[in-house]
């Protein structure tokens, strides 16, 4: 049944994230958008993104954009750009701007919430005089060799990440064979975010203290897991002209 599939998908995603190494406190930023974001409830969705982003501001800097990115991915997966087959034949620039206005709002609101929260957090911590300590991750050395097989991580970050997420990548790749089912704007948004998170997570893995396992690839793992499960469970909403 549909209910059983949902529980199976949720259970599998939880186990996958545990295998990658997504820490429990970071999963708050995954659960809130998944539970509360919906194109039918814009205000509830915005509140969920802001609350999750506030938590991100107290957690990890490379997760600042994640609540908004998860919400945007859900939006691209569930919301067709056009409301009818007639509109699909001639999408105007105005329609595209209107469609992207919601994701843009989430992105801006989420980042501002996370950044402001970090400022407040630094101040309340009593270490505002040593604020540079909170941004040391931006200035630490990059150990690029950790991306590939090495003594610290025999498999290497990139090969291991591709191996673990391989079935998910295959699922998304197979879905692109039906590329007309989604407007190109939706595909560009989804694939662009996945590539950005893979590259960004790989860079974070080269920082001192990272690269010994896959825990710094967590942001990428979360999004590719969500996107792949949407396609696998048939929850992606096609454009009207492609619906059977």
Ranges and model annotations:
Residues 31-40, 49-52, 70-82, 225-233:
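Hydrophobic transmembrane alpha-helices
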Residues 5, 100-108, 236-244:
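Signature aromatic-anchored transmembrane alpha helix within multi-pass, membrane-resident enzymes
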Residues 1, 11-25, 44-47, 54-221:
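Transmembrane catalytic cores of multi-pass membrane glycosyltransferases
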Residues 169-174, 228-234:
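Alpha-helical transmembrane segments
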Residues 67, 231, 238-239:
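Short linear functional motifs in flexible/disordered or boundary regions
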